[in-house]
């Protein structure tokens, strides 16, 4: 209920007519306040005229516009009635001020209640929870401040005629109430109305200050329109409090294991709040601590969310799912991988098919990178992958079979089936792909195709002419013989396989090779398996690489706008170098890409904790005194595939006395940080097809770091074996170079024993190591201290001569003993 505004105070309260009556101005709403002496006990009293402009008190009729009051313009009859009524409400000036303040306070509180109610009603209409989310109330502990704020609105509205018994004794000018739960209005130093709210929201110091100071109530400001603005401001603050009373309930996806900060982000809660809840649960954790799904679910429930536990496999499937449903499948070119033993002519065969000269550009004619090309054959496209034939590149060959449709196994007609040929056959069987055998070099005079066929039969490769399903095509890369037949065989097999893939939709494929180029950054060679890869797509590759495709190039270095299924392209724009063999996906946005990588990083972290090891970088101590001789190495290569092959080859060079520690391996040139690490750990830097950058060259000369450059993997592996051999202790052997027979024994005056001997085999020299045997048992061992021929000192005595020798430590010597002259020989150890 809203109280009437005070319109005017005035009139005369006694029998005098109104002249000489002092008035007190109260502003536009309170016009006059008359003070006049009366005849009743000489007591001063005032009369108040209250007019209602917009609102009226409950129970008043519309005609009631004037309340108690007197006026000099009223008639004598009416004046007598007004005087009689004013007698009942005649108050002192102090009491009138107290009553006016009470009216103002009640009016403000009622206005606040109505404004707050109106705002709450508007919120209920405007605020609606999103789909799948519900709005719930805060716990009681959160509602307490809002309840304390609303306590002011619950104060009973005072009526005009109610005055506390002690009101008459109130200090003049003291406005407001003494109850801390009410709202105080007083005039500050600047003349503005300030409000203080009691309860928990008012500090004790402020309350003490308000009670100790003599605060005058400025009636003009208290009843002016500025109060309405304060009411609205208070209502606005209350509206903000009402929003905090509500919380959004979410569906929180929780994996098998999740970090605390990730859980807080999923619930849209503060990390500190989550940690406090965990502490109350008895779980000591930090923001990077991983907690189980059961604990995370309980935390989510305590925040009134709905936990949904999913496995890591299921979450991976949901994040990386690319649905092909509803997409049309269209024919795609076959992906053909050329495999075989080293130097059997794989790259030369591809050069003839592509009409290129890749083999001439390769150092010493050896393929050490996997290559991807696409050619046109009779209007149809074929994608070829060229894999290295060296045994160190077995992982590359395995990746080739995993992304291919057809394998062309190249076997040299003059060399036959070799170890890498057999390995390639096993890869084909494991992958379950179709195969065509190309018997190359049939132009050689010693070519024997029938022998090749029989050798293949021993490894389970049955040709068509013997009832199998493998086509064998004799070809010559040098003369071009039967190349058309080989192309036709590939196209026929591809037609039989009915290769199809969706062209529309998000792209997915495999990383074939990756490297860092000086002017381009990270470059990844990929093959699209489905969908269309376009410039500007956000791509995730493997577990830690993502980015937006800035540019794409085909195998002829032409920039392309899009890549269709089975098309190999070089992609620029990734932030890190992906691993060869990683699967790449096109994601809807960078946020989706980061979410997928964070999930995969969490899986890898869990696997690392379970296994307790990290294969990428050596994390053990650099120096230790209680371990075998170690060789610290830093590997730098031009592409990811070569780095992988080198790491695998080095790991296979094992010896019980020497341990390899790969401190760091990376793609790109040797940098300053590599040199500093090599110096600190006394490491050998193996640089494969890379250079030393400008900043590191001067540092190499200063630090004297051992850097070994190689362009062929054969040489690198042999060099590593040489490093191992240099760390191994040599084999020490004693070789017999002479044999002496004791014929006389003389006692020397110096306390030694002079032995008269006959050299029956070889020779004896001064300083030689000798062992004295008696009945095949060693009685003494030492070096020849003195060697004489008759009375002359000599350096050496040969076969068939007599001599006298003095052996260090020889005392027990008898005639007939045998003295063997030995030579210590060190043999370097060889690692196979």
Swiss-Prot record:
**Annotated positions binding GTP:** 340-347, 386-390, 440-443
Where along the chain is composition biased (Gly residues)? 11-20
Q: Which residues pair up as cystines?
A: none
- Which GO MF terms does the UniProt record name? GTP binding; GTPase activity; translation initiation factor activity
Region described as G2: spans on this chain:
365-369
**GO CC annotations on file:** cytoplasm
Keyword Transferase part of the UniProt annotation: no
* Subcellular localization(s) per the UniProt record: Cytoplasm
Q: Where is the signal peptide?
A: none
Q: Where is this region: G1?
A: 340-347
**Extent of Polar residues compositional bias:** 29-42, 71-87
Where are the residues of the annotated region G4? 440-443
Renumbered to this chain, region (Disordered) spans: 1-87, 120-148, 163-201
InterPro entries annotated for this entry? Answer: EF-G-like_DII, IF2_II, P-loop_NTPase, Small_GTP-bd, T_Tr_GTP-bd_dom, TF_IF2_bacterial-like, TIF_IF2, TIF_IF2_dom3
Transmembrane regions? none
UniProt keywords (A-Z) are: Cytoplasm, GTP-binding, Initiation factor, Nucleotide-binding, Protein biosynthesis
Reply yes or no: does the keyword GTP-binding apply.
yes
Q: Where is this region: G5?
A: 476-478
Give start and end of each tr-type G domain: 331-500
Q: Which domain of life is it from?
A: Bacteria
UniProt region (G3), positions on chain: 386-389
User: Where along the chain is composition biased (Basic and acidic residues)?
Assistant: 1-10
In UniProt terms, what function does this protein have?
A: One of the essential components for the initiation of protein synthesis. Protects formylmethionyl-tRNA from spontaneous hydrolysis and promotes its binding to the 30S ribosomal subunits. Also involved in the hydrolysis of GTP during the formation of the 70S ribosomal complex.
NCBIfam families noted in UniProt: IF-2 (TIGR00487), small_GTP (TIGR00231)
Instruction: Report the sequence similarity comment from the record.
Output: Belongs to the TRAFAC class translation factor GTPase superfamily. Classic translation factor GTPase family. IF-2 subfamily.
- Name the UniProt record assigns to this protein: Translation initiation factor IF-2
Gene name of the encoded protein:
infB
